[in-house]
Every structure is written in C-alpha cells, then in structure tokens.
Design a protein with these regions (language model features):
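Short amphipathic alpha-helix that is part of the acyltransferase structural core
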Residues: 4-41, 152, 164-184
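Conserved catalytic-core motifs of GNAT/GCN5-like acyltransferases
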Residues: 34, 110, 123, 127-147
Length: 184
C-alpha cells in the first residue's frame, strides 16, 4: 500500500523481551555507525525509563521503522531515527516527524556536519521537514569506553533553540540520556 492511505502510529516497546525487539535492534545496528550506537546492555537498561520511547513507526499494519526519543516537559530529543531501507523515499520519515511535532513541543535532533553527499542530503531532508540548524558548538558524549565524543549539528523544529533551551538540552543529554552508557 502507498504511504498516506493509513494512519501513522508509534508503538512503544518498554522491554528487550518484546517479540520484535531483535528485529528492531537489527535495523538499529545496520542504520548507524558503531560510534553512534548504544551498547546492548545500555540499550536494555533504558527501555523502561519513563522519558524514553523506543517506538516502532507503523503505517497501518506496515512496520516502517524506529523513532527512539526522550520526552521531557519542555522538549523532545530524537536520539535515533531510522526507516527500513526498502521503505525509504516514501515519506514515512517525514510523516513520522510530523506526528512527533503534533505533541506541540520543540523537537531536537543531531546530525553529522554536512561535509559529504549523504550528510548534505540528510540535512536537506530535515530542513524540508521544518528543522533548522542551530549555531551552538555541540559535542555528543561517547557511547563507548575509549572513544571521543563526536561533533554534531543540533537541529530543532519549529525554530532555533534559545541559549537557555540549548543549555537545558545539553545538560539533559549529559546527565540523563548519556548517564551510565558504558559500564565503568
């Protein structure tokens, strides 16, 4: 069926024992480079966190992808977002972001600096979805022991973040999202 004929919905998983968890993790692992992936123990630990949403994106009965985000009182931070490769280019990603925006809070995500064709295209995709790049120098903390943090561009919708909003996001990223990401 074509995208748009059915209602898009997010179905939340709260445990690694969910029957679709392994298929979801296979998509997750194949969609991001190692340095942008959580370690499995870390991923399993956060599944039940009240702010964390490990959501499967569905269009009717079609499982289109994953949107993994943190929701606070004042913003939503999309940590990971991916669509199954065979379904890319069919507006699932755009419609999933539109659905997230319906919550009426600023939506924040990070992208690689636009230096090659893929990263330039990705930035263009988010801009077409209403996101704007922010001017803040931003380093995402490392997901793995022995790795450096990585420089990323912070994008937000519906508008740029104020310094205060960026500060609140950066603090939440350090103290909640990235807390205990690898075992000491």
């Amino acid at each position: 069926h074509k995208a748009g004929e059915r209602t898009m919905e997010f179905r939340r998983m709260t445990s690694a024992s969910h029957p679709d968890y392994e298929k979801a993790m296979a998509l997750y692992r194949s969609s991001f480079p190692y340095h942008e992936l959580r370690e499995e123990a870390s991923q399993e630990r956060i599944m039940s966190h009240p702010q964390y949403h490990f959501d499967c994106v569905y269009d009717g009965t079609c499982w289109a992808g994953l949107i993994l985000y943190w929701e606070t009182e004042s913003f939503i931070y999309v940590e990971h977002f991916c669509i199954f490769p065979k379904l890319r280019g069919q507006k699932y990603g755009q419609r999933a972001l539109e659905k997230l925006n319906e919550k009426g809070k600023p939506v924040i995500l990070e992208i690689d600096p636009p230096v090659d064709e893929i990263s330039i295209r990705r930035k263009g995709f988010y801009e077409r979805c209403g996101f704007t790049a922010n001017p803040y120098e931003h380093v995402h903390p490392a997901y793995h022991k022995g790795y450096e943090g990585h420089k990323l561009i912070v994008m937000s919708c519906p508008e740029k973040l104020t310094e205060k909003q960026y500060g609140a996001f950066a603090n939440h990223l350090r103290t909640v999202v990235m807390q205990d990401v690898f075992d000491a």
